[in-house]
Amino acid sequence: MEAAPSRFMFLLFLLTCELAAEVAAEVEKSSDGPGAAQEPTWLTDVPAAMEFIAATEVAVIGFFQDLEIPAVPILHSMVQKFPGVSFGISTDSEVLTHYNITGNTICLFRLVDNEQLNLEDEDIESIDATKLSRFIEINSLHMVTEYNPVTVIGLFNSVIQIHLLLIMNKASPEYEENMHRYQKAAKLFQGKILFILVDSGMKENGKVISFFKLKESQLPALAIYQTLDDEWDTLPTAEVSVEHVQNFCDGFLSGKLLKENRESEGKTPKVEL
């Protein structure tokens, strides 16, 4: 199948026009519950830092040689804005060396693709709350990442080029149970496939559903997509099970693709979404 450059970043193009408003809305979300952490965790040695990173899906750590720079209080201010992210700080020289840090740096660590993303040098010098919020929001990919105009950028920046989408209405009675099984399946493909949730109850996600030629009556459904060559496949499913997800993903990874999708792609003119 011939890849279409105009569709190579199809998810990104679908929602780019809405990005600015969504970013502003997302970064305002915070957790005010009594259990919310108030301060980053101090990481005093390498084992503590390694354990801290390994224990969470997304960790943001400030590696500082100077605690008087503006980036330090800005990092502190992020803790309540992102309750799904673990925050830490370290000034220990051995810790900085272990993570190849040579100056004041804020790093985001992701379990899903084992990535370390750094803000350093000029980025740290010019950092403000809005910039740091955007950096965290874009790059906070979890074992299952909800699709929106912000996370789509991080999804396509990942080294993992195969995306599995569960397209389902979050308001449905079956959502919680299906999501639990979907999350279990995601662990089986860590490092190979990014697992994504698309809420079909949101009007703005309609273009994603139509891209995969799915009808409302076929939902919930799984859709798998390879960013490198635009190949994709779908599997309408009344119930999400670990076995169904595993078989579907294994089939795609082994090169199996529904014949009707290949034929449809060959007949359909390539259009920019």
Swiss-Prot record:
Renumbered residue ranges of the record's region PDIA3-binding site: 230-233
Top-rank taxon: Eukaryota
Motif (Prevents secretion from ER): 270-273
Record-annotated Thioredoxin domain positions: 39-152
SUPFAM superfamilies: Thioredoxin-like (SSF52833)
Key words, A-Z: Endoplasmic reticulum, Glycoprotein, Signal, Unfolded protein response
Recorded consequence of changing residue 168 to W: Decreases somatostatin-14 binding
Keyword Acetylation: no
Gene3D superfamilies (UniProt xref): Glutaredoxin
Outcome after substituting residue 196 to A/L/W: Decreases somatostatin-14 binding
GO cellular component term, pick one: endoplasmic reticulum
Subcellular location: Endoplasmic reticulum lumen
Glycosylation sites: 100
Presence of the UniProt keyword Endoplasmic reticulum in the record: yes
Signal peptide residues on this chain, from the entry's feature table: 1-25
Induction profile: Induced by ER stress.
Gene Ontology BP annotations: protein folding; response to endoplasmic reticulum stress; response to unfolded protein
Complex formation: Interacts with PDIA3.
Reported function: Specifically binds unfolded proteins and may recruit protein disulfide isomerase PDIA3 to unfolded substrates. Binds protein substrates via a hydrophobic pocket in the C-terminal domain. May play a role in the unfolded stress response.
Family per similarity comment: Belongs to the protein disulfide isomerase family.
Protein's name according to its UniProt entry: Endoplasmic reticulum resident protein 27
